[in-house]
Amino acid sequence: MLDDCLVSVEWFAVFPTDPQWVPSQDREDAARAVFEVLMGADIEVKVNRPGRVVLEDAGECIETIGCPACGTLVGENPKAMDWWVAQLDRVWTDSGGFWPLDVTMPCCGVQTSLDDLVYDAPQGFASWSVAARNPVYAMGEEMLALVGAALGHPVRWAHRHT
């Protein structure tokens, strides 16, 4: 634990594209096994089943948040994050987490989901994830597809520095 205080820690998380989707135990085990092989030997891997929708965030790596319809920036870190934070507060419940994710964009009035906003760096919402601490390898699209195939559902990712 002392190393957590002395150096930055990276987490690379993979999670289903549907925020409420949770795999069967067999699919979870298969996806974890594939993920562990792809991430490298001796890497700490953890599975998260929080029982509600959580934000798999990019941490301090998040730079901008954009509208998926018109491209307008609605958030820029560290300034101008008020609208996005207010939306997170609005949808949060203790029982469901961040659900429902419906939002009306302030720029163009389009109805969309907080999960569909354009995040730079990538992040999203999930009820299940698998994550590697300080991974040895970067994961490309082909590797993500392998994890998704083992999971039985398409996946996305978030890379967080803490």
Give short role names for the model-derived ranges.
Residues 68-85, 93-96:
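Charged linear interaction tracts used for macromolecular binding and regulation
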Residues 122-162:
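Long, contiguous alpha-helical scaffold regions
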Residues 1-65:
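N-terminal alpha-helical interaction blocks
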Residues 103-104, 113:
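Aromatic/basic-lined ligand-recognition segments
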Residues 1-6, 116-124:
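Short, flexible, solvent-exposed loop/turn segments with mixed acidic/basic and small polar residues
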Residues 67-70, 105-108:
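Short cysteine-rich clusters marking metal-coordination/redox-active sites
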Residues 85-103, 120-121:
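Short linker/helix segments within small regulatory modules
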Residues 75-77, 114-118:
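Short, non-ligating residues that shape and space the ligands of small metal-coordination modules
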